[in-house]
């Protein structure tokens, strides 16, 4: 067996290498244990948040879609999560091709700014202090998008595109939220 000297002691080759590594590994292990204990006492790293489920998104989209259809409008309805990612999109076969991206954009904008996109349109008109918001990529400052909230927390947005006006789109979006609002508050 090979013999080495570690800290003045004679050891065999294998255990000598282990002895050196053991000391080197022990220090990071103690630091890791210490950091775990510190994080247990420190601030939380994850935030609990309400999340809109796909079934609720679909129910809201369907209710908005049917409300518009009964009014004689051919529209697209989109529901997004709080990050603006599409959860449900319903498009009438006769709705214009632009309505899909516009509905998603309205829903995402409503969620991002936490406000009715019709109000955002008024607040960002030319000459207003916030008019530059209209130039932000992905922002759709046209009526028809509403934030979706549950127990006071933002969980997503709904957007409707294709009705004769932004106000008509908004009425349909409100019908979609109303269809699921009781269930959102219970969960």
Which sequence ranges carry the predicted segments?
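Flexible, solvent-exposed loop/hinge segments and secondary-structure transition points
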Residues: 39-187
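Intrinsically disordered, low-complexity peptide-like regions
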Residues: 5-8, 34, 167
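Bacterial N-terminal signal peptides
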Residues: 13-16, 21-34
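N-terminal secretory signal peptides that target proteins for export/translocation
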Residues: 1-19
């Amino acid at each position: 067996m090979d013999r080495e000297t570690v800290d003045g002691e004679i050891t065999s080759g294998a255990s000598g290498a282990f002895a050196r590594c053991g000391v080197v590994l022990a220090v990071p292990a103690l630091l890791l244990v210490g950091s775990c204990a510190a994080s247990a006492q420190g601030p939380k790293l994850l935030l609990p948040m309400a999340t809109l489920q796909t079934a609720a998104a679909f129910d809201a989209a369907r209710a908005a879609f049917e409300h518009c259809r009964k009014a004689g409008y051919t529209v697209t309805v989109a529901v997004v999560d709080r990050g603006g990612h599409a959860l449900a999109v319903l498009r009438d076969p006769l709705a214009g091709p632009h309505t899909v991206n516009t509905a998603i954009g309205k829903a995402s904008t409503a969620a991002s700014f936490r406000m009715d996109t019709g109000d955002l349109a008024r607040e960002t008109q030319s000459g207003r202090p916030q008019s530059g918001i209209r130039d932000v990529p992905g922002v759709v400052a046209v009526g028809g998008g509403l934030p979706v909230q549950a127990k006071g927390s933002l969980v997503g947005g709904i957007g409707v595109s294709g009705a004769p006006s932004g106000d008509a789109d908004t009425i349909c979006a409100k019908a979609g939220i109303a269809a699921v609002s009781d269930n959102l508050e219970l969960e």
